[in-house]
Amino acid sequence: MKYSYLLLILLLSNLYKEGFSQGQPDSIVLSATIYDESPIVTDFEIETYYNGVVEGIVQPDLGADGTPVYCCGDSPVTENGRIVVHNQSTFYSWFHSVPGVNVPIPYDLTLTRVGDSTYAYQSNSFFPIDGNGFDNSTVYPNEPHYLGHNFHFCMKIHYSFTYHGGEYFTFSGDDDVWVFFDDVLRIDIGGIHTAASRTVNMDDLGLTVGQSYPWDFFYCERHTSQSTLNIITNLNFTCSAYDACGVCDGHNDTCCMVNQCSESPINPCLIQACGPDNNYQCEFVDKICNTTNDKCLVESCEIGFGCLAIPKNCNDNDPCTTDHCDPAIGCYYDKFDNCDACNAVDTCITNDLCFPRECNPRGNPPCLINPINCTSTDPCIFSYCENGVCIPTYICTPTPSVTPTVTPTVTPTVTPTVTPTVTPTVTPTPTTTPTPSPTTVPPRPTPTPLPADPPPYDLEEGCLVCRDLDCEKTGKSCTYLENETIRLFECKGVGCCKYTPTCY
C-alpha cells in the first residue's frame, strides 16, 4: 500500500510537470529601449582602449531613476593607464535620452523556449539597430560607420519575476553588462572585452518564495569588431506597466522613433519635433539657424539652400553718424561733431530699395548712397538684392553622384568608390574632377545652372521636376539644386531625391 501511494505521488508529479510545460509559451518578448550612440562620443570607439573585464564601474545599488550609478563622479575609470569611461557626464547618455548625443529606439528581445520552462536568446552577431539612428546615412550623413554594422549602442530592460525556488539567470557576451536583482548588482562585467559569462542562482540571494522582485538588465556595445549576446534563464518575467511607446517600465522616450520622426524632410529648413508637448507625435517646425557667433552676420534659412549668413545692415538712417560693425558686439556708431542733420525726404529720394539714398550733412555731395550688402559667407551662394531683400542663388555646378564617363551600365556590379561600411563616411575627395595646381588658388565657381529639361539623369522617379514648378509664369527660369543631405551616399526610395528644382 505504501509503495502504491508513492507511485501515485510520482505519477501526479510528472503529470503536473508535463501540464506546466505544455502551458508555457514558445517564446517570451522582452521590450527594451536601445540608445544608439554616435561613435564620435567619447566613451564609444575609444581609440586606445583597455581590452578586458573591468568591475566597479557602477555602484552596487541601482539608482533612484532605475539606472546604474557611475562610480567616480567627474573622474575617469582607467585600467593599465587606459581610459575605460571618461566621467559621469559621458556615462549618463548610455541609459538616458540626450538629444543630439543618442537616439532612443524601441526593441523587442525575443527569448525562445528550449526546455520545460527554460528560455534562451543566442547571438554571436547582435546588431539590432543596423541602419537606424546614427547609422542612417540619409538622416546623419556625417556620422562614421564601421564594418557594415552599428557597433555603438546601449540597451536597458526592466521587468519583474516571482521567486518560486530553483530559478537562475546566465549571461554570456560583450561589452559592458550589469544585471540587478532586487535593485542589487549581481552581474558586473563592465568594460570593452571579448565574451564573458556569469550565472546567478536565485536560491543564493535570500529571496522569499512567492514574492516578486525587480530585474534590471543593462548592456552596451562600444567597440568593433564583435557583438555577442547570449541569455539562458527560467525566470518567469512579468511587467507591471507599459509606457506610451510599449516599453515595460519605460519613460516614453522611444515614442518619437515609433512615430517615425527620424525621417528627414527634403526641406532643409524644417526639423523634427516630438515630445510630451505634442503627445509624442511627429511634427516639423522651422529650423533656427545658429551656426555663427559673428554679430555682424544675420542668419536665416532659405528653402533649397539651408542656413545662410549675410552681413547685418547697420544703417541707422542717421546722417550724423558713421556706421560700424564689430563681430563681437555688433553694430556701433560714431557721432559727427557739430553735425546738423539734413532733411533727406525732399532732396534724396530712394528710387531703388537696394541702393537707399540719404542726405549728406557735410553738403558735398548732397546725397549719399548706402547699397545693401548681400555677400554670402558660402562661396557657392551668390546673393543679390531685389526690392531691398537679399536673394540667394546657387552658383556651383552640381556634381553627379555617379560620373557619366565611367559608363556604369557596362559593369553594374563594380564596388562603389564610396564604401561607408568599411571606413568612416568622411567627405570623400572626387577622383574625376581636375585638381588645380597646388601653387594656384582655385577660381571661384562660375554659374552653370542645370537645364530645366530634361531632368538630371540620376533623379529618382517620383521626385519633383521643373515642370511641377511652372517658373515661366513668374518670368523666371528653373534649374536643379543638388540635395546636400544625400550628396555623398547611395540612397533609394521616398525622400531620397538627389536634386531639388528651384526658380531663379
From Swiss-Prot:
Biased composition (Pro residues) is annotated at 431-453
Q: Which is an annotated Pfam family here?
A: PA14
Which residue ranges are recorded for the region named Disordered?
417-453
GO terms under cellular component: extracellular region
Positions of the PA14 domain:
111-251
Extract the InterPro entries matched here. Fibro_Slime, PA14/GLEYA, PA14_dom, Prespore-cell_inducing_factor
Which residue positions carry a glycan here? 87, 136, 236, 252, 290, 373, 483
Where is the protein situated, by its record's location annotation?
Answer: Secreted
Q: Where is the signal peptide?
A: 1-21
User: Per the record, where are the segments of Low complexity compositional bias?
Assistant: 417-430
Which cysteine-cysteine pairs are annotated as disulfide bonds in the entry?
none
Mind telling me which PROSITE patterns this protein's record contains?
PA14
Q: Which key words are in the record?
A: Glycoprotein, Secreted, Signal
Q: Which family does it belong to?
A: Belongs to the prespore-cell-inducing factor family.
Q: What is this protein called?
A: Protein psiD
